A protein has these predicted regions:
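Short hydrophobic alpha-helix segments
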Residues: 42-44
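Short helix-loop-beta connector
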Residues: 65-69
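Short, flexible loop segments at the rims of nucleotide/cofactor-binding pockets, characterized by
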Residues: 49, 76-79, 165-169
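Local cysteine-cluster metal-coordination motifs and their immediate loop/turn environment
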Residues: 52-53, 71-90, 109
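A short, polar/charged loop-to-alpha-helix boundary motif
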Residues: 47-60
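Zinc-dependent deaminase
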Residues: 2-20, 83-207
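Short loop/turn motifs at secondary-structure junctions and domain boundaries
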Residues: 22-26
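Short beta-strand scaffold segments in enzyme catalytic cores
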Residues: 29-38
Length: 207
């Protein structure tokens, strides 16, 4: 596989993740592409509500063809036993030969452990491909992990957004924004004529 091929497959994984943004809370939206002998054999994205995870979706679709394949994932595969088994272990059990990861997961129960599981199993690991794009995709998730606060960007243009602010007071707006964050929504629109359009949002979120 060439570097151009790697970038193309990771771009597809990022697009799959982006398409699920705002639908996977409390988990981040992840994309996964499985490639074998230069051919895409399966794709997956984190499903609504946060599970199944992207890797599980792709592995289930690929079946036995996953053996010897390369997996392109936008975020480090999970390593802990929660409501589902670790995706890192699933990749090992499926016989995946190589895993390309865009960025490391900052969640304390993963944070390098997923990579360690894969590496210990003899899987070739490459990290950092399209890292900037992946970090931008997960900026809200990482912010919530580090501070407990949502990361909110206010766009006054009527473009694509996950939700629209309707609260009319700062107190109500704060509650509504945190509700949006809990639901995994990252892009909130404030209409230009909204009474809170000129509010200091950083101050709002930290009060």
């Amino acid at each position: 596989m060439t570097a151009i091929d790697d970038a193309r497959y990771m771009d597809l994984a990022l697009a799959l993740a982006q398409a699920q943004q705002g639908r996977t809370a409390p988990n981040p939206a992840v994309g996964c592409v499985l490639v074998r002998q230069g051919r895409i054999i399966a794709t997956g994205a984190t499903q609504d509500g946060g599970r199944p995870h992207a890797e599980r979706v792709a592995l289930d679709a690929a079946g036995d063809q996953a053996a010897g394949a390369t997996a392109y994932v936008t975020l480090e595969p999970c390593a802990h036993h929660g409501q589902t088994p670790p995706c890192a272990e699933g990749l090992v059990q499926a016989g995946v030969a190589r895993v390309v990861i865009a960025c490391q997961d900052e969640y304390h129960e993963v944070a390098g452990r997923g990579v360690a599981i894969l590496s210990d199993a003899g899987i070739v690991i490459e990290t950092g491909l399209r890292k900037a794009a992946a970090t931008a995709l997960y900026c809200g998730f990482f912010q919530r992990l580090s501070s407990g606060l949502p990361q909110v960007a206010v766009d006054l243009r009527a473009g694509l957004y996950d939700a629209e602010l309707t609260a009319a007071t700062p107190e109500a707006a704060k509650a509504q924004i945190h509700a949006f964050s809990a639901a995994g929504m990252n892009r909130v629109r404030v209409a230009p004529d909204h009474p809170l359009a000129g509010l200091d949002w950083a101050g709002l979120l930290n009060t």
